[in-house]
Amino acid sequence: MTILKQMMRKLKNEKIHMTLIDPAAKSPDESAKIAKEAEMAGTDFIMVGGSTDIDERLMDQTVSAIKENTNLKVILFPGSSNMISRHADAIFFMSLLNSSDREFIVGHQVKASKFLSLLGIEKIPMAYLVFSPGMTVGRVGKANLIDSFDRETALSYSLAAQYMGFKLIYFEAGSGAPRPVSEDTISYVKSKINIPLIVGGGIRDPETAMRIALAGADMIVTGSIAEKSNNVYSVLRNIIGKIKSIEIKNSV
């Protein structure tokens, strides 16, 4: 079964939590330790990547270390065409739709496509939208930031992504953002699309995660909170416990 199908099946019964690990922030061994504690806490998938350009060697080392120490599927979350590892299970083949730079919309994707065709990893088409404040990814990706409360612009991009055939949409406030994308925007967009919505950035406590999930996020991503914590298991267990407690009434 493909990872995308696993996600869709799981979403019929529960929300999904993914832990994002940035190889630029931690050594491969440290990344593996975070992933192991995240697995024990109940995370569903590990994402590896970030907005800082990282070479293939470091990506390989990090993904391999995580695979050796956990039973979780690893999904690449690349910031450029260099951030690919043959050891991963899948890649979010993503387009930063609100970038002002063609490279982040389709350029890096074109550069990586031939190499990816040689690898046995799953490619998951995903639309990536960066909201204010954007943080590093907004700057590096030259994003025309969407205001967190501008639900009409968010909806226009999201519907365009759905009509173009993307399988997932990711709302990003930026790693380390002081707050996540507005719950009103999430709820409004989710009510009008029929593909899964991922939300990340600014989610660092159980209460915030719960609000974002209840607003309509199908998948919650946390990254910085795990990187900075001395007790990854405890921090993530509280967050994951909250979102997993939500009763699913309508399947995606």
Swiss-Prot record:
It is an enzyme of class 2 (transferase). It catalyses: sn-glycerol 1-phosphate + (2E,6E,10E)-geranylgeranyl diphosphate = sn-3-O-(geranylgeranyl)glycerol 1-phosphate + diphosphate. Its main location: cytoplasm. It is found in: Cytoplasm. Keywords: Cytoplasm, Lipid biosynthesis, Lipid metabolism, Magnesium, Metal-binding, Phospholipid biosynthesis, Phospholipid metabolism, Transferase. Pathway: Membrane lipid metabolism; glycerophospholipid metabolism. Sn-glycerol 1-phosphate binds at Y170, F171, E172, A173, G174, S175, G176, G201, G202, G223, S224. One of its GO terms (molecular function) is magnesium ion binding. Mg(2+) binds at D22, S51. Its EC number is 2.5.1.41. GO terms for biological process: glycerophospholipid biosynthetic process. It holds the Pfam family PcrB. This is Geranylgeranylglyceryl phosphate synthase. It comes from Thermoplasma volcanium (strain ATCC 51530 / DSM 4299 / JCM 9571 / NBRC 15438 / GSS1).
